[in-house]
């Protein structure tokens, strides 16, 4: 297994995953929270626009005054500013909290694995709790495969991974092929810009369908209302 940074490993240990229970590892942005629409509103208020021409941020953010495309460091700076100001204010995806609550009652342990800046970890936890999703949060850096593999190894049973990013599905399948990967993008306009990655085991389009596929992958009888 790939060596994990000490800070990430400490968070994984603190997540409290128990052996012998089914595990759900969920991304936050575009799975639990409506990130892209909120980010676009944020940058438009500050003199930028979003092209919606591809499934990526870099290359799609332009300065409204002259149409200049922002490069990766500039987009990263906008993201840092966005999360510093709005991490607690991003609206939840409809149906996510209710579905997770039903899965938790059925015995599923849930961990939120997010690549939000480390400085906003507490804000993300607060936002999740306020929106009835009080689950452990692990702030990851880079590909999520090593962290997901660690969590699944600790659980020792069926595990499901949900993420909007194709690269993370590739990373997880490489690190832990036994994890069921479900590709989910909450914002329909963004979802149209990306195909299901070949490593993903499913591509549900809404939370009722996603809940049913999670339950089926974990061998449960609940799911999907």
Over which residues does each language-model region extend?
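Active-site neighborhood of HAD-like aspartate-dependent phosphohydrolases
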Residues: 1-72
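Short, charged, surface-exposed secondary-structure boundary motifs
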Residues: 146-149, 190-198, 213-215
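Short acidic-hydrophobic, aromatic-tinged amphipathic segments that line or gate anion-handling sites
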Residues: 136-142, 199-209
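Metal-dependent phosphoesterase signature
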Residues: 62-95
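Glycine-rich phosphate-binding loop signature in dinucleotide/nucleotide-binding domains
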Residues: 18-19, 106-108, 152-158
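Substrate-recognition element of Asp-dependent hydrolases with the DxDx(T/V) motif
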Residues: 87-92, 96-127, 137-139
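Acidic, Mg2+-coordinating phosphoryl-transfer loop and its flanking beta/alpha structural elements
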Residues: 161-205
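Substrate-recognition "cap/lid" segment bordering the active-site pocket of phosphatases
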Residues: 117-160, 166-175
């Amino acid at each position: 297994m790939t060596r994990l940074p000490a800070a990430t490993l400490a968070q994984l240990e603190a997540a409290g995953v128990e052996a012998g229970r089914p595990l759900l590892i969920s991304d936050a942005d575009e799975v639990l929270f409506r990130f892209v629409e909120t980010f676009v509103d944020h940058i438009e208020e500050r003199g930028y626009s979003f092209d919606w021409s591809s499934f990526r941020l870099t290359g799609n953010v332009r300065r409204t005054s002259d149409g200049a495309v922002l490069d990766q460091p500039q987009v990263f700076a906008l993201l840092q500013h966005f999360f510093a100001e709005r991490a607690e204010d991003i609206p939840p995806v409809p149906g996510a909290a209710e579905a997770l609550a039903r899965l938790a009652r059925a015995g599923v342990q849930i961990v939120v694995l997010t690549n939000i800046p480390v400085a906003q970890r507490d804000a993300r936890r607060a936002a999740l709790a306020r929106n009835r999703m009080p689950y452990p949060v692990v702030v990851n850096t880079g590909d999520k495969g090593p962290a997901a593999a660690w969590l699944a190894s600790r659980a020792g049973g069926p595990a499901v991974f949900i993420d909007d990013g194709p690269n993370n599905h590739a990373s997880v399948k490489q690190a832990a092929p036994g994890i069921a990967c479900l590709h989910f993008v909450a914002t329909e306009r963004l979802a149209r810009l990306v195909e299901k990655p070949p490593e993903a085991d499913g591509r549900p389009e809404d939370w009722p369908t996603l809940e049913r596929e999670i339950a089926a992958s974990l061998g449960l009888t609940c799911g999907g209302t």
